[in-house]
């Protein structure tokens, strides 16, 4: 009985250790802790009519220089004690979260850790979190150790509040022809301007 109990315990540990979900292409539905981490093996797309809910505690790891293009409803809402993480899987930086013009303005990033990203490499996505012709909310997130801009707004009225943005190689928050609500953010170790208003931009701070 003792041997059986030990074997069952070891099998349970092995199952937990190897629990992961590989993802690529079109995604939707609900991502749960039970199936975490989610490993992106190629670019990800959330289509305009689809919804993705990411539960607190989930880790999303990009297994290469891949991006996530968001056209639908995206709800990554963690908690103060149980964040959602977007990071690299290994030593190669991933690209970015790109909220495009069809993205639902009710989309949210809240209590997320976003790290080791870089720019997507094509206009108008010059940050690690990008809002292009869309106005979701990002709050209580930590964005760190990223190349190029931390958060980039392009023709956007996004709410950007109470985030920590640190160790960024370009601008912390950049607004290009945008009017965002930028409040309560902490920015440090930013290579260039912490908050850059570019080309007829304005913000409530």
Give residue spans per PLM region.
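Bacterial N-terminal signal peptides
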Residues: 4-15
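Beta-strand/loop edge motif enriched in small/polar residues
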Residues: 17-205
